[in-house]
């Protein structure tokens, strides 16, 4: 499941995904691009079955959309939802400083709500970040139902997460991705996601470009119709 969706083949988790693909009899792909990648890698000549089934994360998002709950904290009426936790950002003090300088400036315009990952908090403390003077609305990490509520009610998503890029799309929100690459290239190709790395000016400019942009095209369902799990089950029942 989630076969061929990778962004950097030198990362341990991506290597594990490739190895899992190699030993699998059925490869369930979430997107057209993932299916195309497998064919280009020669899987059409290997004794395996390739099935495009859609994304099981969208199944979950649609199922829980009406079951979400607001975090038990005071939140601004309009806000940007942000997460920062990837090692390439948190372990590089220069990247981390650039990202948070951009977020501080953005939060002057539209409050940035940021569930703070423990590793990110420790790294910020390590570079002398002054939380008492910050304009960002830091909150404790939230559960899935609270995150769904934040996704449904935010103006825009800013993240370095892989999954949150897709979840932003599921809930009709543009995403500013603070990474240099993404496994979800169809979101970039269709204009729903912008890669900005850790460039402060690019982060701020892309926020300004997308925060009030008309939300069009989200109905195209790049990841299926929310029935990926059923398609997987149907394929397995034919074995």
What do these predicted ranges mean?
Residues 1, 29, 52, 115, ...:
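Short beta-strand scaffold positions
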Residues 67-153:
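Donor-nucleotide binding loops and adjacent catalytic segments primarily
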Residues 23-95, 196:
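A nucleotide-sugar donor-handling region in carbohydrate enzymes
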Residues 33, 194-239:
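Leloir-type glycosyltransferase catalytic cores
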């Amino acid at each position: 499941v989630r076969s061929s969706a990778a962004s950097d083949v030198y990362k341990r988790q991506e290597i594990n995904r490739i190895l899992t693909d190699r030993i699998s009899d059925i490869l369930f792909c979430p997107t057209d691009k993932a299916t195309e990648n497998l064919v280009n890698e020669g899987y059409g000549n290997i004794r395996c079955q390739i099935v495009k089934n859609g994304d099981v994360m969208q199944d979950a998002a649609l199922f829980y959309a009406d079951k979400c709950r607001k975090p038990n904290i005071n939140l601004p009426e309009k806000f940007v939802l942000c997460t920062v936790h990837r090692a390439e950002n948190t372990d590089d003090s220069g990247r981390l400083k650039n990202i948070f300088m951009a977020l501080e400036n953005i939060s002057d315009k539209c409050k940035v709500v940021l569930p703070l990952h423990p590793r990110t908090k420790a790294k910020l403390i390590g570079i002398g970040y002054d939380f008492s003077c910050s304009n960002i609305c830091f909150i404790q990490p939230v559960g899935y139902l609270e995150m769904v509520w934040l996704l449904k009610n935010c103006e825009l998503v800013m993240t370095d997460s892989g999954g949150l890029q897709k979840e932003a799309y599921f809930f009709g929100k543009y995403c500013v991705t603070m990474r240099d690459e993404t496994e979800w290239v169809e979101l970039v190709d269709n204009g729903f996601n912008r890669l900005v790395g850790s460039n402060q000016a690019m982060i701020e400019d892309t926020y300004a470009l997308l925060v009030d942009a008309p939300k069009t095209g989200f109905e195209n369902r790049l990841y299926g119709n929310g029935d990926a799990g059923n398609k997987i089950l149907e394929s397995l029942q034919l074995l």
